Amino acid sequence: MIKEAIAKLVKKEDLTAGQMNDVMEEIMTGEATDAQKAAFLTALAAKGETIDEITAAARVLRAHCEKFLNDMDVLEIVGTGGDGSNSINISTLASIIVSAAGIPVAKHGNRAASSKCGTADCLEALGVKIDAAPARMAQILKDINICFLFAQKYHPAMRFVGGVRKEIGIRTLFNILGPLANPAGASMQLFGVYSEELVEPLAHVLHNLGCKRAMTIYGMDSIDEISLSADTKVCEFKGDEFKSYTIKPEDFGFTRCKKEDLAGGEPAVNARIARDILEGAEGPKTDVVLLNAGAAIYLASDGITMKEGIEKAREIIKSGAAKKQLERFIEETNK
């Protein structure tokens, strides 16, 4: 099937969901050759992925992941990465704050690919045992409302595309698929994308995949988070109701900063910054974390505004609950 699919893609023809399913099965089982995978991913990227193509591919990747037993509605704050911003680990810190608010968060991530410090690198530098057994992580999620799912542990079939992705060196379908394949089956997602063109399509993909509520976001300074240094494009849905809008930092009382004000560094640097933020340090790095954590609290809650979500996130830091949550996370994963 993959050869026929490549022939369609080079003619700029879309694949049906069934065709994408068949091609992904060939890729995820190691049946397709490296040359075929490279040609397919390049041709698909050049054509542009449709909602149906991404949905079908994500379903196959989910089917091939290691199972994680979870029966709770969980939130994930995640991004496609590859934005080149080398910022602090915003979504990681927001996840800790949101979980301290009593909202279950299953953070799914990996080591750095294009940045200096990925989610896994930051948590490890903070002292979290990132590769705890799935059953242990499931229990931690139940006990303290947060867990970390180390992507390479749960997606063994990704080994069939890792080399090809590095060698062709362009963004491909798999930059989008990874964040769509949380093994805990996140039913709520604050989902950052690397392109404005993906904001609305990815919201519909999440809806197709059974997500109950989500916000897909793109910071207009090319960041896959809600930005403090630019406006942010948003597509939100709760149930079947979709709405698109723009977030401005000033709308929530924040002062717009320069993009470089949000820069991080190596894992040890980002871990130190993370502790400072959770201990109540002020400044743009804390503000951008509050903006994203507040949006996530708003998304996962009923009857509150985003501004109220941000104030709740601020109070969680001020009360010491966020710092305490990190310490519990470290302690529980190292038992």
UniProtKB/Swiss-Prot annotation:
Listed pathway(s): Amino-acid biosynthesis; L-tryptophan biosynthesis; L-tryptophan from chorismate: step 2/5
Catalytic activity: N-(5-phospho-beta-D-ribosyl)anthranilate + diphosphate = 5-phospho-alpha-D-ribose 1-diphosphate + anthranilate
Binding site for 5-phospho-alpha-D-ribose 1-diphosphate: 79, 82-83, 87, 89-92, 107-115, 119
UniProt-annotated binding residues for Mg(2+) 2: 224-225
Gene Ontology biological-process entries: L-tryptophan biosynthetic process
Keyword S-adenosyl-L-methionine: no
GO molecular function: anthranilate phosphoribosyltransferase activity; magnesium ion binding
Annotated binding of anthranilate 2, by residue: 165
Catalytic activity, EC: 2.4.2.18
Key words of the record: Amino-acid biosynthesis, Aromatic amino acid biosynthesis, Glycosyltransferase, Magnesium, Metal-binding, Transferase, Tryptophan biosynthesis
Cofactor(s) listed in the protein's UniProt record: Mg(2+)
Binding site for anthranilate 1: 79, 110
Alphabetized InterPro entries for the sequence: Anthranilate_Pribosyl_Tfrase (IPR005940), Glycosyl_Trfase_fam3 (IPR000312), Glycosyl_Trfase_fam3_N_dom (IPR017459), Glycosyl_Trfase_fam3_N_dom_sf (IPR036320), Nuc_phospho_transferase (IPR035902)
Note accompanying the cofactor annotation: Binds 2 magnesium ions per monomer.
A single Gene Ontology CC term: cytosol
Entry superkingdom: Bacteria
Subunit structure, as described in the record: Homodimer.
Protein's job: Catalyzes the transfer of the phosphoribosyl group of 5-phosphorylribose-1-pyrophosphate (PRPP) to anthranilate to yield N-(5'-phosphoribosyl)-anthranilate (PRA).
Protein family according to the UniProt entry: Belongs to the anthranilate phosphoribosyltransferase family.
Protein name (database record): Anthranilate phosphoribosyltransferase
Source organism of the structure: Lachnospira eligens (strain ATCC 27750 / DSM 3376 / VPI C15-48 / C15-B4)
Gene: trpD
